[in-house]
Curated annotation (Swiss-Prot):
UniProt GO BP: thiamine diphosphate biosynthetic process; thiamine metabolic process
Keyword Kinase: yes
Pathway named in the protein's UniProt entry: Cofactor biosynthesis; thiamine diphosphate biosynthesis; thiamine phosphate from thiamine: step 1/1
Its EC number(s): 2.7.1.89
HAMAP family: Thiamine_kinase
Native source species: Escherichia coli (strain SMS-3-5 / SECEC)
Function: Catalyzes the ATP-dependent phosphorylation of thiamine to thiamine phosphate. Is involved in thiamine salvage.
A Pfam family hit: APH
Gene3D superfamilies assigned: 3.90.1200.10
Protein name, UniProt field: Thiamine kinase
Family statement drawn from the similarity comment of this UniProt entry: Belongs to the thiamine kinase family.
Amino acid sequence: MPFRSNNPLTRDELLSRFFPQFHPVTTFNSGLSGGSFLIEHQGQRFVVRQPHDPDAPQSAFLRQYRALSQLPACIAPKPHLYLRDWMVVDYLPGEVKTYLPDTNELAGLLYYLHQQPRFGWRITLLPLLELYWQQSDPARRTVGWLRRLKRLHKAREPRPLRLSPLHMDVHAGNLVHSASGLKLIDWEYAGDGDIALELAAVWVENTDQHRQLVNDYATRAKIYPAQLWRQVRRWFPWLLMLKAGWFEYRWRQTGDQQFIRLADDTWRQLLIKQ
């Protein structure tokens, strides 16, 4: 249920107006992040979410609601309410582990997602790369960063192998191991894009695990594994730049030192791979 309001509600106003019988579960935070919290009434649980990036346009949060509204409940939480700065979705019971599942199981989840109807908006990386450059700390903007940005601008994004709905933030912390199978949470970056971009973006432990994931996916998708791996590799420079830029952007936004460390590590990876 989308609900429009020009004035953002406080947490207490949200609960009293829309969920008067529910109460926050203050001792529970498994699988929750950012400003999310859990509410409960007679065994029914919802997750109340806020945008992770307070500076992102409201349209990005609305797109997340629309994506969840059309996805099957077997892979994503169903949304119940959207309004300015708030979204309420089903809580997915299960375990959030610190490591990825078996590659064949994960490949099955991603392949099933990629068979769903497209969301209706494309993921384009170049505008994000330029935004992160513009919004980063000027003292951190180097000639090398600008040179790589111009190189990607000239090259243009790889032509999609197959265009499908993507999650685009697949890592262990966004996977719920439920009794009915794997499910994905945190759909804030979802959109339509190349299946190889999704596979390239998975936060894997090492190259061997990555190759196995791609091979397992290729078997399901009836694509030659070598062809799919080549396409995945074409996206690597784009994704490394995306990660580095995002970490720089978040550093300036939050002042959190972990983002500087992550950015520096990603820049080192780019130097190794150039």
